[in-house]
Amino acid sequence: MSAHFIGILAALGSAASWAVGTLLFKGIGEEFSPLAMTFIKSLLGLLLLAGVLGLAGWEPVKSFPLGWLALSGFLGISLGDSFFFAALRRLPAHRLVILMLLAPVVTLLMALCFLGERPAIIGWIGIGLVLGGVSLTFKEKIQADEAGDRRGPGLLFGVLSVLAMAGSVIIAKIGLQDVSAMEATFLRLSFGFAGMLVVGLVRAELGHWLAPLRQAGLRWRFLLAVIVVTFGGFWLSLYAIKRLDVSIANTLLATEPVFALPLAVIWLKEHPTATSIVGAGIALCGAGILAFNG
């Protein structure tokens, strides 16, 4: 089995894990602020990864990749995840994950500028389909009710999350050259956690952030979500980014809606409209073109 094919499987596995993780966090998100969710997720993820690396062994990391991974962690976790959780509290799960389809487009453009990747004409067609599908998904008029009032800020936080995460992926690609995906995941989480720790200390909110974990049922559900996104979401995504071109890896990560839409219907009893489903289908066609022809 080639490294390229394994990278593709890793990207698809990461997409599936993020779909499950998003729905798990959606179910408990009302109990935590976005900053609290990012802080606790990073803390628990670090403990899990430390245990695995303690058993598997740790290779020394040079200062060059360490600096890039530190910046990637702060941008993608401290900022990107906080924006993501803020959007998650304001948007239906299926709508948010379709918005996340913008990530491969933004990342591809950044890869074009900063990594020298050059997609073929068919790749630009894929970009158009992704943008068209996402636009179609948000074609419906937002009603001026309480839920609608929350969707405007939700869209803003979602876009900010896409920008932060796309930038962090480009930076991570540079730092991954001489570091294993598992160690890179640990380092990114470490620096992301450090950023959140500083925020919590400055705002004197650490106790408030951790308070909901006193509920045993909530604590175990949160831990399950963290296990899924740490090993399935974070680690597999970095493995894919290490093995594949950034544009291909991130486009495959955008297949998350394939898993999220049916899960949202079954699990959260949400009802995506026909327009959302068609938009997701068009966007995923574009994602497929980018993945296999970009």
Where are these regions (language model features)?
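Loop-to-transmembrane alpha-helix entry segments
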Residues: 63-67, 100, 111-136, 140, ...
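Hydrophobic/aromatic residues within transmembrane alpha-helices
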Residues: 28, 37, 41, 87, ...
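Hydrophobic/small/kink-forming positions within alpha-helical transmembrane segments
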Residues: 19, 50, 74-78, 104-109, ...
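Hydrophobic core positions of alpha-helical segments in small-molecule transporters
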Residues: 13, 40-41, 72, 99-102, ...
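Membrane-interface interhelical linkers
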Residues: 1-12, 16-36, 40-71, 81-91, ...
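Residues that define the loop-to-transmembrane-helix transition and helix capping
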Residues: 35, 94, 120, 182-183, ...
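Hydrophobic residues within membrane-embedded alpha-helical segments of Major Facilitator Superfamily
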Residues: 10, 17, 24, 44, ...
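Alpha-helical transmembrane segments of compact multi-pass small-molecule transporters, enriched
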Residues: 44-48, 99-113, 128, 190-195, ...
